[in-house]
Amino acid sequence: ITHHNSLDMELYLRIAPELYLKRLIIGGFEKVFEINRSFRNEGLSVKHNPEFTMIEFYAAFEDYHYLMNFIEELFKSLFDSLGFKNTVTYQEQAIDITKKFERINFHDSIIKFCDSISSENLNDYSYLESYCKNHDIEVSVKDSLHKTQLDIFEKEVEGKLIQPTFITEYPTAVSPLSR
């Protein structure tokens, strides 16, 4: 049970199936998944709905390369089962589901999509702060280098990722679940 702050009401949903699935992995199952409804009491926004359906899965003894390949094949199989051929149109963009999904690391994606950011200035906090000011990206005085890079990624890169893409090497400083 939790109280939803934005809607001022009591809700009875779990936040994730993680604990139950990990117990199964510890119990000897090598691969597990669940499709479920979850709830996160983190407010409402265009990027976040507190109640949502998700799929969560775990595979013992595998690495993130295996997981990316698995997800790619899962989506291709799903689209094929739904009768889509080579492309699907989403928000007037043709998504080619036959090509290998792009894999690009977090920092390289910023360099790729932000013309004036390079490997030489990507870790220069003063430069990034100035970049943010010139591109209407809000930065707090307390923000770290990685948080500022994340703000740039969210504002300048995310919207340009049209084709299926895996962003790897996400900074651990801004995501407790990344490695």
Where do the model's predicted regions map?
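Class II aminoacyl-tRNA synthetase-like tRNA-binding/catalytic domains
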Residues: 1-66, 76, 133
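Internal, well-ordered alpha/beta segment that forms a basic, Gly-enriched binding/recognition surface
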Residues: 17, 30, 63, 74, ...
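Metal-assisted phosphate- and nucleotidyl-transfer catalytic regions
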Residues: 81-179
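Hydrophobic (often cysteine-bearing) scaffold residues that line and stabilize catalytic clefts
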Residues: 13, 17, 67-71, 145, ...
